[in-house]
UniProtKB/Swiss-Prot annotation:
CDD domains: Ribosomal_L29_HIP (cd00427)
InterPro entries listed in its UniProt record: Ribosomal_uL29, Ribosomal_uL29_CS, Ribosomal_uL29_sf
GO BP annotations listed: translation
Name of the gene this protein is made from: rpmC
Cellular component GO terms, alphabetical: ribonucleoprotein complex; ribosome
Signal peptide: none
Species of origin: Bacteroides fragilis (strain ATCC 25285 / DSM 2151 / CCUG 4856 / JCM 11019 / LMG 10263 / NCTC 9343 / Onslow / VPI 2553 / EN-2)
Family assignment from sequence similarity: Belongs to the universal ribosomal protein uL29 family.
Name recorded for this polypeptide: Large ribosomal subunit protein uL29
Gene3D superfamilies registered for this protein in UniProt: 1.10.287.310
Amino acid sequence: MKIAEIKEMSTNDLVERVEAEVVNYNQMVINHSISPLENPAQIKQLRRTIARMRTELRQRELNNK
């Protein structure tokens, strides 16, 4: 997910998306430990996407104060 797409999302949508992506990330890590994924770089990409979303949420929080 690109930064521009993240910035266009509403705060509520962003919170829901972060929660869903964290669940997806945890499931992916568990699946990878059981049997290797075809593309283990997906784990890294998903982790970074979650970080981008959390960063945007934090920036919005600081701008509202």
